[in-house]
């Protein structure tokens, strides 16, 4: 004898299949979503670059104007001591320079662009410091973190030496990156926290006038 399902059991079975089917997502959809999510995450990975351009208040402010730069922090690098703070660096006890660490989106701005931008916001002819600030801690330097950055920096420097709009020699060195020590909170975004004092200092130091004298409209 052939057994048949009762109407109630049949209805329950159909309902159960419907619930299961409604919660099934095709594998292709999951894969596509995962690939899209991975692509978005890869675009958001930031790179970092380190530059010393005299007073870190100023070079921090300059780099934060550049599209693709997500964050700039002030700090100290290039020295021999295993620690650094404003007092010891200013009194030249550690060999460090005032510097900035730039976090940037390479899909928006390239390392080569950062290097070119750096050159045009410093005085690369000054071997005593930068602008009104003199002393070892205010010397300029470009720090590379890997072979690719080194090649880009060397290529940029070579081109600059051929095309520079001034006669003086370029003395800013290209150096392998060392440990970067974050500066005190007081110095971070100083130009935003103390705009009047910062503006007075920057104008008084002659930074913008000297940059304009060297580079004209090449910024």
What are these regions (language model features)?
Residues 2-6, 11, 16-219:
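Flexible coil/turn and secondary-structure edge motifs
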